[in-house]
Amino acid sequence: GSEMCIRDSMAGVYSDMAVTGIGRMACGVEAAADLRLAYRWSLSLAASGGRYKYIRNPRVTVISDVDNSAVDTRAESHMGGCTLGAAPQLTACAELSYFGPRGWGFRASAGYAGLRYVEPVPLRRTARIARQGGITREMFDAFTHQERLGDAFTFDASLFKSFYFGRSRLTASLMLRNLLGDADTVYSGYESLRVRRIRSGDALYFAPHATRYTYAYPRSFYLTISYKF
């Protein structure tokens, strides 16, 4: 289970929320290979595929911080079948390395992450939120649908130079991350706990707040120096 302090937008009070009976399932396969292409060239490959999901509906209890009254007690949250948002379900990467004379070398790599989803929130999938707030089918789906993130691609490169002192080694590396400079790549996301109130004349409607996203770093450069002895 889990506990947290929240602002319950539907009740209009700060509350403590406890979620119990969370069930998760994770399974997958992975494979990797290192290939020696030539005396100074090598290629590393790796891929994985998995299924990470919630396997049952947890129970949500919300207690008001104002007077310790129960806002919602052991409400069923329809999260069964939702996907965990912490990891992509498909990944692949390849790295080409060159080790030149006098300690020079470089690496170039490409990565892919797919079947990614935002982290679902139990509160908005309870009947109090999804059915009371989602008075139309479209709005109900907005509260309960889990958003899928776009596939992500990365391209990186590094140039390095090693200096040897007996059994010791000093290595200076210049690393270039996100060579394509794609600043719109979403790294992760999670659903908001908040609910928007929308007034239209005398009618009051509810809608979920927008998903919170974390974006990958834009094109970046790093200079590192390491010493092994």
Give, region by region, the residue ranges found by the protein language model.
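Short, small-residue-biased leader/transition segments that mark boundaries at the very start
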Residues: 1-6
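Solvent-exposed loop segments that connect transmembrane elements
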Residues: 7-17, 57-80, 122-143, 189-210
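Gram-negative outer-membrane beta-barrel transporters
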Residues: 12-124, 226
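Alpha-helix initiation/capping motif
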Residues: 20-22, 85, 148, 211-214
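Residues that define the transmembrane beta-barrel architecture of outer-membrane proteins
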Residues: 23-27, 86-92, 151-155, 168, ...
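A cross-taxa feature marking solvent-exposed loop/turn segments within ectodomains of secreted
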Residues: 38-40, 150, 165-167
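C-terminal beta-barrel architecture of Gram-negative outer-membrane proteins
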Residues: 85-164, 188-189
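C-terminal beta-signal and adjacent terminal beta-strands/loops
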Residues: 112-130, 161-229
